[in-house]
UniProtKB/Swiss-Prot annotation:
GO terms for molecular function: ATP binding; phosphoribosyl-ATP diphosphatase activity. The keyword Lipid metabolism does not apply. One of its GO terms (biological process) is L-histidine biosynthetic process. It is found in: Cytoplasm. Its EC number is 3.6.1.31. Belongs to the PRA-PH family. This is Phosphoribosyl-ATP pyrophosphatase. Keywords: Amino-acid biosynthesis, ATP-binding, Cytoplasm, Histidine biosynthesis, Hydrolase, Nucleotide-binding. It comes from the Bacteria. It catalyses: 1-(5-phospho-beta-D-ribosyl)-ATP + H2O = 1-(5-phospho-beta-D-ribosyl)-5'-AMP + diphosphate + H(+). The keyword Hydrolase applies. It is an enzyme of class 3 (hydrolase). Pathway: Amino-acid biosynthesis; L-histidine biosynthesis; L-histidine from 5-phospho-alpha-D-ribose 1-diphosphate: step 2/9.
């Protein structure tokens, strides 16, 4: 796998390919088999662990927990049928817009 920003797309492709495969042979397949609720729960747990690492542990721990969080987010996206390109497009749309203005525009919809 690449060591640049494309790694997320590559990882997403691998993750999506595990959907419907043998859960005894793949942790990712096991997550899919357990359903969206479990996937979302695991993402939430990893997000909390990332926050804890940021507040009380070293950079190495933060990096590791961040990788776990991103992995579980990608599993959640794959389960929901959301491809990374859609998220990147939304981030690009928001680039150059202040967070305050962007939030105001969502409130009006």
């Amino acid at each position: 796998m690449a060591q640049d920003s494309k790694i997320l797309e590559e990882l997403y492709t691998v993750i999506a390919s595990r959907k419907g495969t043998d859960p005894d042979k793949s942790y990712t397949a096991k997550l899919f088999a357990r359903g969206r609720g479990k996937i979302a729960q695991k993402f939430g747990e990893e997000a909390v662990e990332t926050v804890v690492a940021a507040l009380s542990e070293g950079k190495d721990e933060l990096v590791g927990e961040s990788a776990d969080t991103l992995y579980h987010l990608l599993v959640l996206w794959a389960d929901c049928g959301v491809e990374p390109a859609k998220v990147w497009a939304e981030l690009a749309r928001r680039t150059g817009t202040s967070g305050i203005d962007e939030k105001k525009s969502r409130a009006k919809k």
